[in-house]
Amino acid sequence: RTRYLERISGPLLDRIDIHLLIEPVDPKLLLPESGARGRLERQRRLEEARALRDQVLQARAAQWARNPSGLANHRLEGNALHEVLALGRKEKELLTLCAERFSLSARSHSRVLRLARTIADLAGSDTVKTDHIAQALAHRRAGQTLDGEEDQESDRTLFSG
C-alpha cells in the first residue's frame, strides 16, 4: 500500500476527496448462508441499503434546497461555500489548527469544508459541527501524517481534544 501511494503525486492525491483504509474481506463472508438464516441476513442487508439510500436522498434534498442555484455541496466555491457553512468559533479553531498542523493546501482546505458540509447533511444537521470537520479531515488523511507514516493515534488525540 505504501509503495502504491508513493507513486501517486501529492497534487493528484489532493484532488481525491475521501481516502479510506479498507481491510480485505474474509472470503467466507462472501458466500451466502442458506436457509432461513441466509434469508434473514439478506433481508437485513437490504433494509440497511434502503435506509442508506433514504439518508442520501434526504441529504441531496437538503443541499438543493439550501445551496445557491440548487448546487450540490461539491460544486460550491468561495463565498457560496462559506455562506452555507456558517462555522462557529470552535469549528473555525479546529479547522485552523488542523490546516496548520497538516499543512493543508487551499484546495484541501476547501475540499475538507465541502466534505464536512456533506457529512453534516447525511447526519441531518443544519450546521457543520466539530465532529463533522474531524470526520472530513480523517477521511482526507486516512493513515497519513506529515511525514507520510501511519499515525492515527496522534490524530485521535487532536480530534478528541
Task: Describe each model-derived feature in a short phrase.
Residues D155-F159:
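Extended, low-complexity, charged intrinsically disordered regions
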Residues R1-E149, S160-G161:
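Basic, amphipathic alpha-helical bundle interface domains used for macromolecular binding and assembly
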